[in-house]
Amino acid sequence: MIIYNEAIESEVMDVLKNCGLENFTKIPGVFGKGSSSGAHFGNDIWPGRNNILFVACEEEKCKKIIFCIRELRKKLKKEGIKAFVLNLEEVT
């Protein structure tokens, strides 16, 4: 699962494409608050929104994606992107 500020959409998608990510499910326009990037609630007080990408992949691909996200985080600093690795029991 990758959560990121919608303002960096093109950078995120470019990096993930170059990293070999082809398949995902995107949930646009979600609200949240991070410890370093602040609140994004889509209103006048806390503008901005986040997007979520769900990615189901094998372990080697996961490691590559995590590496790409870490490199992007170094470049963007506090713009707001996090990746979470969750165990996937089964895909039908």
Which residues fall in each region the model found?
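Positively charged, small/polar-rich N-terminal and surface patches that mediate targeting and assembly
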Residues: 1-92
